[in-house]
Structures are given as C-alpha cells and as structure tokens.
C-alpha cells in the first residue's frame, strides 16, 4: 500500500491516495498519521465534508488532540467558514490558554478577519510565552506601524534587532523599508546607530550593515 501511495503522490492523485489511507485506517485504527494524511488528501480535493468525517472518525477511535483540532479548524477555513474555524480554536484556547499552536492559529484567523487589535493581543500572549517568536515580533511591528503607536512600535523594533530568531534577511528588509521613507528615518533616528552596531556584532561578515551605518553617519 505504501508503494502505491508513493506512486499516486508523484502524480498528485489525491483521490487514490485518500482511498489507500482509508484502507490503512481499517488495518490500524489507532495510527494518527493515517487519519491526518487522509484528511489532507480530501482537503486538497476540496472535499471538506469527507475531511470532517475522517476527523470525527479519528476523534472517536483515538480521542481529540491538538493536531486534529487545528486540522478541523483548517478544514473550515479552507471552506471559507472562518467564523466556525475561529470558534473551534477559541474553544480549544479557553481549555488550554498557553498552547502556542492554538495561539498561532488564533492570530492567523484574526488577521484573516482584519481584526488587527485582537491579533496583536494574541501576539502579545505569544511573546509572553516565547519572547523571541519571530512571527509574533514581525507581525506586531507591522500592526503597531499601521496603528501609529510609536512607543510600542519602537519597543518591538528594538526587540527584533536584539533577537537571534529574526533572520538577517528580515532585519535587512526592515532597514530598507525605513531608509526608503524620510519620515521613518526621522522616527527611528535615535535608534538606527544602536541597531546597526548590534547587527555588525551579530553578523560581522555582512557588508550591508557597514555600508548603511557609514551612509547614515
């Protein structure tokens, strides 16, 4: 069966793959991976009701778990039923408020709904648990920029450049964004030398930071 699944995977035949994963579920009803693979196949086919049936079967045979909860939410999201998707994650979050995966999914759904204040509240919770989470840092930075909350924006800006989790490329992108706008240069002028010095210490072989610092001074 595995050989056939590999063959169908190469041809993107999700229908046949789903059938085989369901056959494997009948052989081993306690194997979580079989359910998840079948669910993804049906999601790729746009067969969301079938995907939900597999989730229900997994919850019955294995019990509810984090992966299944997030997958269930994703099925509704892919089916453009965002409110139902959000409801599932909110219920899970209430039972386990410090679960990072639920928080990440919750922030993603709030962004989809353009509810940026709620999304930022979730990012703040993520950063309380995982202070160097790059997604939360970068997203919070963008939200504070759009809301013109300068103190919070500067605070997150400095955290980004002190973080080893935010990549060099992401930091360069932020600097390019700032240096392409005179208003932003003015806004960050007291902090630019500090963050550039930090970048040079962290990435001594990256010429870009030396050039930008030289031009700025």
What is the predicted role of each segment?
Residues 1-217:
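Alpha-solenoid helical repeat scaffolds
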């Amino acid at each position: 069966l595995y050989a056939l699944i590999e063959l169908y995977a190469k041809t993107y035949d999700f229908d046949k793959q789903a059938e085989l994963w369901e056959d494997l579920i009948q052989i081993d009803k306690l194997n979580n991976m079989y359910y998840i693979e079948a669910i993804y196949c049906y999601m790729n086919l746009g067969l969301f009701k079938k995907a939900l049936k597999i989730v229900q079967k997994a919850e019955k045979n294995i019990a509810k778990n984090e992966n299944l909860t997030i997958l269930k939410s994703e099925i509704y999201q892919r089916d453009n039923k965002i409110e139902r998707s959000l409801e599932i994650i909110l219920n899970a979050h209430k039972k386990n408020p410090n679960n990072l995966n639920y928080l990440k999914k919750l922030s993603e759904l709030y962004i989809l709904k353009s509810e940026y204040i709620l999304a930022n509240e979730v990012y703040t919770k993520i950063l309380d648990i995982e202070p160097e989470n790059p997604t939360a840092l970068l997203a919070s930075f963008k939200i504070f920029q759009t809301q013109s909350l300068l103190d919070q924006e500067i605070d997150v800006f400095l955290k980004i450049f002190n973080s080893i989790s935010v990549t060099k490329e992401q930091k360069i992108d932020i600097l390019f964004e700032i240096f392409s706008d005179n208003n932003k240069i003015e806004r960050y002028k007291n902090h630019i030398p500090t963050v550039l010095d930090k970048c040079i210490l962290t990435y001594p072989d990256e010429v870009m930071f030396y050039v930008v610092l030289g031009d700025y001074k």
